[in-house]
Amino acid sequence: PQESAPTGEETVLELATSVSPELKEALATLRAQPDPESPERAEAQERFAELDGFSLEAKAKKVLSGLAFQQDDFLQPARTLSGGWIMRAHLARLLVMEPDLLMLDEPTNHLDLETLGWFQEQVAKFSGSVLTISHDRAFLNSICTGILEISNRQVRRYLGNFESYLTQKAEREAQHLAAYRNQQREIAHHED
């Protein structure tokens, strides 16, 4: 994803766990209300549990590790990372978030081979929809089950992976060309 660089002292782990304003608000209330008998704390704790907040940190650490972060990196200020590592931290946040729609812009840039393999597996088993822009054909082949092509103000849907899309598109274009040639022959025949 093309995200802005982190500022302040937000750690890599905090960046990866900043998944929802509701969760952040519930956590802030929990920290601000030390009294276990407080109704506000009880409500915040219930909301935190509903949002799966108790497993969030463990999940984020697992995802960060999959993206090749070392445990020592988790508490490092995110602003000290290079652009490629910041991108990985944002990818971690997206995977931890588990949105219904995952939008990725050149997500394989800055990933080494091992990390790329892990990331492909995560995206391939993602339960929501994925909208991605990528020049990495191998990545597209491994994750795509359908392609939407936007061309000439039209949207066409193709089922299958990227190679299947290329084959289907070539077949469609060949059919259109054959139909056009037949039409031109008919026109020429009627003009004679």
Q: What are the residue ranges of the model-derived segments?
A:
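ABC ATP-binding cassette signature C-motif
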Residues: P1-N182
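Short cytosolic helices in intracellular loops of multi-pass membrane proteins
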Residues: R181-D192
